[in-house]
Design a protein with these regions (language model features):
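C-terminal substrate-binding subdomain of Rossmann-fold SDR/epimerase-dehydratase oxidoreductases
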Residues: 18, 24, 31-39, 55, ...
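N-terminal Rossmann-like NAD(P)+-binding domain of SDR-like oxidoreductases, especially those catalyzing
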Residues: 1-187, 229, 235, 239, ...
Length: 290
C-alpha cells in the first residue's frame, strides 16, 4: 500500500517542495491550508500540471494548527503514516509584534498535533520543523545537536518549546517523534520579505531601470544558506530512520549578505563598486553610477 503523508503548512516554501518530493516518491499526500480571502496556493499550483506527479494522490484540507478540533479531525480522518509540521509564523521581527499568536501557532500547534497522535494512533511518525533561531545567542560555533539553546525572540522561544514537547511526548508515549533544526534555506518560492528574495527582487528592478536603490542592514552579517529542495529531503530521511532522533540540518558553510549581493550582481551583469565603510558603505553600479 502507498504511504500517506500529512503536511501542516503545505502552502509554504517547504510544504510545496516536500509535497512534490513525496508525490514523486509514490506517496498519497494530504496538505492542510488555512482559509484566506486571497489565493494562497500559488506555490503548489504547478503540482496539477507536472507530468511526473499523479494529481489524484494530492488532497487539500482546510484547517489550522491553532484549532485543536480541526487538527484532530483531519488526522483522524486521514490516518496518515507520517505527519510533517511545517506550519509556523516564521518571521522573527513579526514575532515581537505578535508574540501570543506566534506562541499559539509555533509552540502550541506542535502540542495539538502530538496530542492527536497519542489519541488516534501512536504509530504515526511525526516531524517537527525547528529553526537555527533556537540557538539565538550562540554559546559555541558551529552549533550541533548538543548545543544549548539561547533563543532571542518570541519565535525562537516558541520553537524551543515545540522541540522539547516533541521530545517529551516521544519519551512519555514511545512515539516516533523527531525534530529537524533547520538553518536558513532558500529558493524561488521563499517569501519576499526574507533577505535573499529581497535582494534578488530589488536588484532585478535596478537592472530593469524601475528602481535605483536597495537598503540593507549589516552586509557583513553571515548566514548558513542552503536550498529548500535539499532540506525537505532531509526531513523525509529523518522519518525513515530506525529510531527517532533529532538532527541539525545545514550546509555547514557561511556567506555574508555582501557576498550574496555581489553574486546576484554578477549574475545580472552589474559591475558593483563598493565605497565607504560602516553604515556609510554603499555599492554603486559602475556603468550607470547608481
Amino acid at each position: 500500500m502507498k504511504k500517506v503523508a500529512l503536511i501542516f503548512g503545505v502552502t509554504g516554501q517547504d510544504g510545496a517542495y516536500l509535497s512534490k518530493f513525496l508525490l514523486k516518491k509514490g506517496y498519497i499526500v494530504h496538505g492542510v491550508k488555512r482559509r484566506a480571502s486571497q489565493h494562497n496556493t500559488f506555490r503548489i499550483d504547478d503540482i496539477y500540471s507536472d507530468p511526473l506527479i499523479k494529481k489524484n494522490n494530492f488532497f487539500l484540507h482546510y484547517g489550522d494548527v491553532t484549532d485543536s478540533i480541526s487538527v484532530f479531525s483531519i488526522i483522524n480522518k486521514i490516518k496518515p503514516d507520517e505527519i510533517y509540521n511545517l506550519a509556523a509564523q516564521s518571521h522573527v521581527a513579526v514575532s515581537f509584534d505578535l508574540p501570543e499568536y506566534t506562541s499559539n501557532t509555533d509552540a502550541s500547534g506542535a502540542l495539538r498535533i502530538l496530542e492527536s497522535i497519542v489519541k488516534i494512533n501512536k504509530k504515526i511518525k511525526f516531524y517537527q520543523a525547528g529553526s537555527s533561531e533556537m540557538f539565538g545567542k550562540v554559546v559555541e560555533t558551529p552549533q550541533n545537536e548538543k548545543t544549548p539553546f539561547y533563543p532571542r525572540s518570541p519565535y525562537g522561544v516558541a520553537k524551543v518549546y515545540a522541540y522539547w514537547i516533541t521530545i517529551n511526548y516521544r519519551e512519555a508515549y514511545d512515539l516516533f517523534a523527531t525534530n529537524g533544526i533547520l538553518f536558513n534555506h532558500e529558493s524561488p518560492l521563499r517569501g519576499e520579505t526574507f533577505v535573499t528574495r529581497k535582494i534578488v527582487i530589488a536588484l532585478c528592478k535596478i537592472f530593469l531601470g524601475s528602481s535605483e536603490k536597495l537598503y540593507l542592514g549589516n552586509i557583513y552579517s553571515k548566514r548558513d544558506w542552503g536550498h529548500a529542495e535539499d532540506y525537505v529531503i532531509a526531513m523525509w530521511k529523518i522519518l525513515q530512520k530506525n529510531k527517532p532522533q533529532d538532527y541539525v540540518i545545514s550546509s555547514d558553510k557561511q556567506y555574508s549578505v555582501k557576498y550574496f549581493v555581489d553574486l546576484v550582481c554578477k549574475l545580472l551583469g552589474i559591475k558593483l563598486v563598493w565605497k565607504g565603510s560602516g553604515i556609510k558603505e554603499k555599492g554603486y553600479w559602475k556603468k550607470k553610477n547608481i
